[in-house]
Swiss-Prot record:
GO MF entries: electron transporter, transferring electrons within cytochrome b6/f complex of photosystem II activity; electron transporter, transferring electrons within the cyclic electron transport pathway of photosynthesis activity; oxidoreductase activity
Protein name, UniProt field: Cytochrome b6-f complex subunit 4
Subunit note: The 4 large subunits of the cytochrome b6-f complex are cytochrome b6, subunit IV (17 kDa polypeptide, petD), cytochrome f and the Rieske protein, while the 4 small subunits are petG, petL, petM and petN. The complex functions as a dimer.
Residue spans crossing the bilayer: 36-56, 95-115, 131-151
Protein's membrane topology: Multi-pass membrane protein
Biological processes, Gene Ontology terms: photosynthetic electron transport chain
One Pfam entry name: Cytochrom_B_C
Location within or outside the cell: Plastid, Chloroplast thylakoid membrane
Cited function: Component of the cytochrome b6-f complex, which mediates electron transfer between photosystem II (PSII) and photosystem I (PSI), cyclic electron flow around PSI, and state transitions.
Length: 160
């Protein structure tokens, strides 16, 4: 028994739909009007309803009030800046830190050119892009966790 539904290309109705351009190069239903008119608004309204519902049912506390006369012991950036903060903190030379952050978008720009070597490759399977994504995600989490630790444990996370 197969999990995938294979199209019956001998079916004249399916051939007529594919000849009209319905679907893509693979078997499927058209985006217009099925997705754009029916599924997208349901997803958007569902997301908005979830956000409003969570905001009403579980409001986030603001925390303690700011005191302009007391400096906190450790000043940390927002959570989404943790990886870059840790990278700048760990690399001793500031120029190397900035260049290492500039290397990230440059490396991401080169990925499509590396992937495009095999023209007959299935566009849904991108091994290089998948590996770059997994490595980047793992590195970002690792550096983000390390940003909350002392600088002696920033890269090893206390494991080594």
């Amino acid at each position: 028994m197969s999990i995938l539904k294979k199209p019956d290309l001998a079916d004249p109705k399916l051939r007529a739909k594919l000849a009209k351009g319905m679907g893509h190069n693979y078997y499927g239903e058209p985006a217009w009007p099925n997705d754009l008119l029916y599924i997208f608004p349901v997803c958007i309204l569902g997301t908005i309803a979830c956000c409003i519902g969570l905001g009403v049912l579980e409001p986030t506390p603001l925390g303690e009030k700011a005191d302009p006369f007391a400096t906190p012991l450790e000043i940390l950036p927002e959570w989404y800046f943790f990886p870059t903060f840790n990278l700048l903190r760990v690399i001793p030379n500031k120029l190397l830190g900035v260049l290492s952050m500039a290397a990230v978008p440059i490396g991401l720009i080169t990925v499509p050119f590396i992937e495009n070597v095999n023209k007959f490759q299935n566009p849904f399977r991108r091994p290089v892009a998948s590996l770059v994504f997994l490595f980047g995600t793992f590195t970002a989490f690792w550096l983000g966790i390390g940003a909350t630790m002392p600088i002696t444990q920033a890269l090893t996370l206390g494991f080594f």
